[in-house]
Amino acid sequence: MIGGGILLMVAALCLTGFNVWDGWRAGRESQKVLEQMAGNTVENRTDLSGVSELSGEEKRLPVIPVDGNDYIGVLEIPDQNLALPVMEDWSYPKLRIAPCRYKGSAEEKDLIIAGHNYDRHFGGLKQLSPGDPVEFTDVEGICYRYEVAEVLTMEGTAVEEMETGDWD
């Protein structure tokens, strides 16, 4: 019985250690991408805005390609000293690197960014307060400024509420 308890404690410590390491890794990856994005010039950017309206696909945005992933801009939360690259489209493996555009665009005022709760990513969002500034700068250098109106915790399955909420 004691051996089983010790085994469970060791497993819990290993899991905690992995989670801490994974958060550190994600923060390092995001910073590496930011550095590479900063070195890109307008000539190195890819304009993917020519997707046919008839195709039913969402309009693609100008991007900066870095290590096989396309990035649409940088999200900054000054009060948390946080700057993160934002990938053009999302998947679970991509969320392990950086926040991702879930849907929409800043220009159309319907941008939804999905992110992981790593300490070096979105882990501190729950500490934001109404009035805190948030900025998104796209790869063309256009800065969209926002202000936190409310901090709301939603279930991970609340996709419809997230997509249809009146957030602006």
Q: What is the role of each PLM region?
A:
Residues 2-168:
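Solvent-exposed, non-transmembrane regions of membrane-associated and secreted proteins
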